[in-house]
Amino acid sequence: MTIGIIGAMEEEVELLKNSMPSVEEIVIGGAKFYVGEIAGKEVVLLESGIGKVNAALGTTLMADRFKPEVIINTGSAGGMAEGLAVGDVIISDRLAYGDVDVTEFGYTYGQVPRMPAFYQGDAVLLKKAETIYREYFAASENKAVYGLVVTNDSFIMRPDQHETIRTFFPDVKAVEMEAAAIAQVAYQFDIPFLIIRAISDLANQEATISFDEFIHLAAKQSATCIIELLKTI
């Protein structure tokens, strides 16, 4: 089984890449693929670049060239739900776009025409994650949270951005810039997927400072959770 893992930034894939005993690097269209093993599993690790287009391009290249049987997205996210803290982990059971609006044509806000309004994380992977992380976080000051992640081609920090997202997605747990695009490509290729992100900021007016300070912590937390999950796949 080949497992695809995708992160947008170097910081988000570095720990996973360093976990590979040997690595083959392949660059296609600016997307950096690292082929090797993690936890005894065949892995294709992608540093896609930031944003929905980069994420969709890289995921499509991964699906077409490397034929992964599972895709997992790692990285950071901005917390939107009450009670979330930096270092908490969000496992997404649903994903949506926060900046797509074709409601004039009868679609739900966030829905791309002829695509589902929400992309569902794989039920089997979600169950595995829930079992693993219940034990993993039992003695930790951080926690794992499950729920809706909303993807935007913007870094969310302003009150007006919050208001728009909460208006259409009142149960949103976190926001970021790639996951729904990865989920859409996985959906179109019929590849099971799971999104595991760690909170780097609280998507508020201090978000840029928090992100710069805590991106490495979030990346480490997310990557560690993924390595634990790989042991069970």
UniProtKB/Swiss-Prot annotation:
EC number: 3.2.2.9
GO molecular function: adenosylhomocysteine nucleosidase activity; methylthioadenosine nucleosidase activity
Pfam families membership: PNP_UDP_1 (PF01048)
Superkingdom of origin organism: Bacteria
Keywords: Amino-acid biosynthesis, Hydrolase, Methionine biosynthesis
Top enzyme category: hydrolase
Catalyzed reaction equations: S-adenosyl-L-homocysteine + H2O = S-(5-deoxy-D-ribos-5-yl)-L-homocysteine + adenine; S-methyl-5'-thioadenosine + H2O = 5-(methylsulfanyl)-D-ribose + adenine; 5'-deoxyadenosine + H2O = 5-deoxy-D-ribose + adenine
A single cellular component GO annotation: cytosol
Active site: 12, 201
One of the GO biological process terms: L-methionine salvage from methylthioadenosine
Binding locations of substrate: 78, 156, 177-178
Similarity comment text for this entry: Belongs to the PNP/UDP phosphorylase family. MtnN subfamily.
PANTHER family: 5'-METHYLTHIOADENOSINE/S-ADENOSYLHOMOCYSTEINE NUCLEOSIDASE, 5'-METHYLTHIOADENOSINE_S-ADENOSYLHOMOCYSTEINE NUCLEOSIDASE
Protein name (Swiss-Prot/TrEMBL): 5'-methylthioadenosine/S-adenosylhomocysteine nucleosidase
Gene: mtnN
